[in-house]
Regions:
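Active-site phosphate-binding strand-loop segment of PLP-dependent enzymes
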Residues: 369-433
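N-terminal "arm"/small-domain region of PLP-dependent enzymes with the aminotransferase-like
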Residues: 240-296, 384
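PLP-dependent aminotransferase-like
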Residues: 327, 334-391
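Conserved PLP-binding catalytic core of the aspartate aminotransferase-like
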Residues: 515, 528-562
Length: 605
């Protein structure tokens, strides 16, 4: 058996990644793609390895021969403009007719386990296929009950709902010499004579299936890692997937600050979610209107403020809608100066917007980071602050001050001419009924009050980037509306606000389910040896690590070994102890997290 490597079948170079070299010369863990592939193949003592394509001037022959391979290596160059997989196969036809062959694209990186299974697979022609992932560009396959390929869909199929439940080719194949000579080659030659269209290897297989009722056996990707590198983004993702440096993997993944759909095999306990909302019906309504929303401009601030006012029951002049709460935090914080009170640990986006000289910090030192309105008043009453900022429930502790106590704080700040900014991004999750301060009567009574709310966090739609700020200080609200862009939210976010009211009952049901799951999750965490659970009223739980467990070590182990993101709190809390903040997801995900923590901390299966 031999291995045929199709060198740079796409014929592209990765701009800004490696300007002088093709994809196969990119380095991963210190070695190039082609060197990695050749070393993997060399382990199996093939009769020969044939590299097909490329230009002799690129030096791939000299580079490959310098590796001291045990397996003989041959080269077939292609100096013509044609460089499709089909043309490269045709260039190697004499080799392919001589013996059975593995066929590989040179832009692939994969685990050796996948190569081993392909070599041992049975069939005249075998294709490695994988469950669809949104980065895959191979052909979609149609399978019979024996998992044989009986057809190929177009490479750029537009039915992505079907794609999610489908399989695609990977660029790894095994051909018998007889099949290639008697079946594939005649159709390949005929196709190349009659068509100038660049096509993939699957094109001829599809013709053979239709013309000769041929079957293609399959080898499934299981837990194997693999990636096809076609551009700078692929190179970045593959670096993360295959890096041997655990610290580098952690830094790259956490440093992206989102976009984790690129890593579908990972579970995110870093960012905060609403596990039981939005409902399928709401999502389907968004999908049904996708095309209209994609091609239509959103409304301006006036219309969107009206939608937000309708949804939250306040006057239009008292509310501004933002591209996430972060946009509104930046805007409102630019309006305040002077001594500003913060209760810490807290959400750092607020204090980061002011100078250190303006900070008046109240560090909470109680065992569970609990505090109430009286604690706040007693601490700040002689500090001469002009602004006070409070996240309620607090992030990361989950501490909550009830509505009655908040009224006491409202009165104290008003009487002392202190601006009070309350972040209620997590208030919907508390056990208290009707806890919010977003009520027109409250706003009218307290002109010093500004309430921020992240719709992304509360309603489980972070991709829409939505937030609101309400206040009866209409001058500040009017200024903020001019400060942000007139089209600061997109059509999808606007449409969500337009239909949200129809699903309010569903939202309340989802919150009830969530509160039950929060209780269950906290109880399960208490059973994990080495964790101390801090009671929370939010959609996250803060835990202290005991017995000398290092938070950064645990974060890396959970990421690398268990494919779970978790958040450490070392930069927020300065008491020398180790803490985590864990999102609360649905019961299935929470069970997976608990099991993973037990495995990592105590080697429990």
């Amino acid at each position: 058996m031999q291995a045929i490597i199709l060198v740079d079948a796409q014929g592209e170079k990765l701009n800004n990644v490696n300007k002088k070299s093709n994809m196969h010369m990119l380095k991963f863990n210190g070695i190039t793609l082609i060197e990695r592939m050749l070393k993997q193949l060399d382990l199996y003592r093939f009769d020969r390895i044939v590299l097909v394509g490329g230009d002799k001037k690129e030096g791939i022959e000299q580079y490959s021969l310098s590796m001291s391979m045990n397996t003989p290596v041959s080269f077939v160059y292609s100096n013509e403009s044609k460089n499709s997989n089909l043309y490269l196969l045709y260039k190697a036809k004499d080799y392919l007719c001589e013996m059975d062959s593995l066929i590989l694209n040179s832009n692939l990186i994969f685990d050796e386990s996948l190569l081993s299974r392909l070599i041992s697979s049975n069939g005249e022609v075998v294709a490695v296929i994988d469950k669809y992932k949104n980065w895959m560009t191979g052909s979609t396959v149609m399978l019979n009950k024996k998992n044989e390929i009986i057809g190929f869909d177009k490479e750029n199929s537009t039915n992505h709902l079907t794609l999610k439940n489908s399989f695609k080719t990977t660029g790894l194949y095994k051909f018998s010499a007889q099949y290639f000579k008697d079946c594939y080659l005649p159709f390949l030659e005929a196709y190349l004579k009659t068509s100038n269209q660049e096509a993939s290897l699957e094109k001829i297989l599809g013709i053979l299936i239709e013309a000769l009722n041929s079957k293609v056996n399959t080898c499934f990707v299981e837990n194997d890692r693999w990636y096809a590198i076609n551009d700078i983004q692929d190179a970045d993702l593959a670096t993360t997937l295959f890096s041997a440096d655990e610290n580098l993997v952690a830094e790259k993944m956490f440093g992206s600050w989102g976009g984790y759909w690129r890593y579908p095999q990972y579970l995110d306990y870093f960012y905060l979610v609403t596990p039981y909302y939005p409902t399928k019906a709401l999502v389907e309504e968004l999908k049904a209107n996708f095309e209209d929303l994609l091609f239509q401009y959103p409304s301006g601030m006036k219309v969107n403020a009206m939608l937000a006012a309708k949804e939250f029951g306040v006057k239009q002049e008292n509310i501004i809608i933002g591209n996430g709460a972060a946009e509104l935090i930046k805007s409102i914080m630019s309006t305040i100066t002077g001594r500003t009170g913060f209760i810490k640990p807290t959400f750092e986006e607020y204090p980061n917007r002011l100078t250190k000289e303006e900070h008046v910090d109240f560090y909470i030192t109680t065992e569970n980071f609990t505090y109430d309105a009286d604690d706040i008043i007693n601490y700040f009453k002689d500090k001469e602050i002009v602004n006070l900022i409070l996240v309620n429930p607090e992030n990361p502790s989950g501490n909550y001050i009830d509505k009655k106590s908040m009224r006491k704080l409202l009165e104290w700040t008003r009487d002392n001419k202190i601006k009070l900014i309350i972040d209620e991004s997590f208030v919907d999750f508390v056990d208290e009924e009707n806890p919010t301060l977003i009520e027109q009567e409250i706003l009218d009574e307290f002109n010093n009050l500004y309430v921020v709310k992240s719709i992304s966090k509360s309603y489980g739609v972070p991709g829409l980037r939505l937030g609101i700020l309400v206040s009866s200080d209409i001058e500040t609200i009017a200024w903020m509306k001019k400060d942000v862009s007139i089209w600061n939210i997109n059509s999808f976010a606007e449409f969500y606000m337009q239909i949200a009211g129809k699903y309010r009952k569903d939202y309340n049901k989802a919150l009830a389910l969530f509160r039950k799951e929060r209780t269950s999750f906290q109880n399960s965490l208490k059973e994990v040896k080495g964790l101390r659970v801090i009671p929370s009223q939010a959609n996250y739980v803060m835990v202290e690590l005991l017995d000398g467990i290092d938070a950064e070590w645990l974060k890396r182990k959970m990421l690398i070994d268990e494919k779970i993101f978790i958040k450490t709190l070392g930069k927020k809390i300065h008491n020398g102890r180790n803490y985590l903040r864990l999102a609360i997801r649905d019961h299935s995900d929470n069970t997976r997290l608990i099991d993973a923590l037990n495995r990592v901390l105590h080697n429990q299966e």
